[in-house]
Curated annotation (Swiss-Prot):
This is Ribosome maturation factor RimM. Residues 180-194 have a biased composition (Acidic residues). Keywords: Chaperone, Cytoplasm, Ribosome biogenesis, rRNA processing. Pfam families: PRC_RimM, RimM. Residues 164-201 are annotated as: Disordered. It comes from the Bacteria. It is found in: Cytoplasm. An accessory protein needed during the final step in the assembly of 30S ribosomal subunit, possibly for assembly of the head region. Essential for efficient processing of 16S rRNA. May be needed both before and after RbfA during the maturation of 16S rRNA. It has affinity for free ribosomal 30S subunits but not for 70S ribosomes. The PRC barrel domain binds ribosomal protein uS19. InterPro entries: PRC_barrel-like_sf, PRC_RimM, RimM, RimM_N, RimM_N_sf, Transl_B-barrel_sf. GO terms for biological process: ribosomal small subunit biogenesis; rRNA processing.
């Protein structure tokens, strides 16, 4: 498990007054800053990000000290991290997991063989879905994150076991990215009620 959780990435500027567009990986996109200051990948630069608005697929944010488009554009591609210690110590219950701990885990099939790797976690309103990049190429499939479909989650051992419904693997698509630019680790999901967790049901 990582000590710092990826919660978003700056994908570009917005307007001419220093606002930035952030792809938020929190379950509630507007909760990006609810847990305190964020930092870059090195942990040396901290950002007191302020969420101002929401647009299609992104949140519009202000960062103190960033006052024009040039400065905002210079931050493009910056990944934003949150210290795990900033989350409530008792946030997780049984069968609940931080999405960041699932990202990158290999997914094996119950009958043997490797299905792929968890690319991201989505919530389209009917429960969490795992987007798994298939082992044989850059295609992906969405798996319902339920005990029936994902009977084993072992974060400490670093693996998941899946039992996809018949025909589900026929519905594949390219992995999700950010405007074709950001496809690496999407990061943590933080529940909209502020407890920073997700899980199989």
């Amino acid at each position: 498990m990582t000590e710092r959780l990826l919660v978003g990435v700056i994908v570009g500027s917005h307007g001419v007054r220093g606002l930035v567009r952030v792809k938020s990986f929190t379950q509630d996109e507007m909760a990006l800053c609810d847990y305190g200051p964020l930092s870059d990948e090195t942990g040396t630069r901290r950002f007191a990000v302020e969420v101002r608005n929401q647009a299609k697929g992104v949140v519009i944010c202000q960062i103190p000290g960033v006052s024009d488009r040039t400065a905002a554009d210079a931050l493009k591609g910056t990944r934003l991290f949150l210290d795990r210690a900033a989350l409530p110590a008792d946030a997780l219950e049984e069968d609940e997991y931080y999405h960041a701990d699932l990202i990158g885990l290999p997914v094996d099939l119950v009958d043997g063989g490797r299905l792929g790797v968890v690319h991201s976690v989505h919530d389209f309103g009917a429960g969490d879905m795992l987007e798994v990049t298939l082992a044989q190429g850059r295609r992906s499939v969405l798996l319902p994150f339920t005990k029936a479909v994902v009977p084993l989650v072992d974060v400490k051992a670093g693996r998941l076991v899946a039992d996809p419904p018949l025909g589900l693997l026929d519905d594949t698509r390219p992995p999700a990215g950010v405007e074709g630019e950001v496809e690496e680790d999407p990061g943590v999901g933080i529940d909209e009620d502020g407890d920073g967790k997700g899980g199989a049901s």
